[in-house]
Amino acid sequence: MGALCSSETYMLDKETYKKQVEHNKMIEQDLDKDRKLKILKLLILGPGESGKSTTIKQIKIIHDEGYSVEEKLIRRHGIFMNILEGIEEIHLAVGRENKSYKNPLSFDHIHEVRMFTENFKKADEADKILGAEVINAIQKYVKDETVAMMLRDKTVYNIDDSTIYFLDNFSRIIQKDYLPTEEDILKSRVPTSGVIQYKIMLKNFNFKIFDVGGQRAQRRKWLHVFDDVHAVLFITSLSEYDQVLREDATVNRMKESLNLFEKICNGRYFINTAMILFLNKIDLFEIKIKHTNITVALTSYKGPQERDSALDYIRKRFVSLNKNKKRSIYEHVTCATDTEQIQVVIDSVIDVVIQHTMQKVGIQ
């Protein structure tokens, strides 16, 4: 009886063996799909100062726990540095535009700021506060009629928006108990060096988000994060069409961005990768287009000097660079510092990444 039972069991296994192997293979395939979906990699690329790091900050504020008190205290030092660098930026713009100070003491104020900045860079973190003398120098400097005029017409003279913001909030920032707000952090600038990785749970999926330095010298560091990327978010600044690269004053920023997008979009690493395009800084673009035509960068543009027409032309220029006609470019016009607007856009981006990845591994 026992032998019969053994024989029947053997015969049953033999008959179903092939089906069992096929079933196990299907299970392994499903597990493999789960493994592939376990971590989704989103690579954020684009030229320097386009808004990549600001977008990362928004994701942290919207979908994570925001910034702790300790993190805000660390950011405070960076904001002080942004103000000091902003004053130097204004001074350089005065010379670049062949303007003259109305107050001859403005040169003394600049000297005070420069001396303080050098010491600030060398100081220990605990000592990085704005002293009374440099505060006084900054307050007097921005009252110079030439400086005040340039700050009012910031887009004409390409004064960074964060510089304007921090100077507008200077009286609050210099208080001894100053703790940066989330808006302060969004406006702050810390150039990304190399590749910075963030891990975050978004809509029940584990994401790895890579923020990559956009300056030319940083781009060679992109290569090792290209493997198995599920989506690329390319961010470009709409408002910098009349500006040149910091690292090369002969190269227009808009042209550089178009060239970079073309290389990334059609690169061998991203043949099957979802491609998302942020046309960022629409708020500054709307101001600048009123006095500066996009023809300074895009000479083939023949349309009117107004927002919608110029924006549509820029959008089409970017999209036309995609040589893979089977792949869509998911475009969004954004203002990365506008939390309410960017929340809707980021949610859409997350959905695109998840859906594209599921389709890629065969999960519909």
UniProtKB/Swiss-Prot annotation:
Tell me yes or no: is Lipid metabolism among this UniProt entry's keywords: no
| Record's keyword annotation contains Secreted | no
Q: What Gene Ontology cellular-component terms does the record carry?
A: cytoplasm; heterotrimeric G-protein complex
Give residue ranges for domain G-alpha: 38-364
Which residue intervals make up region (G1 motif)? 41-54
For region G4 motif, the annotated ranges are 276-283
What processes does the entry annotate via GO biological process terms?
A: adenylate cyclase-modulating G protein-coupled receptor signaling pathway
In which residues is GTP bound?
A: 46-53, 186-192, 211-215, 280-283, 336
Protein family (similarity comment): Belongs to the G-alpha family.
Name the UniProt record assigns to this protein: Guanine nucleotide-binding protein alpha-8 subunit
| Organism, as annotated | Caenorhabditis briggsae
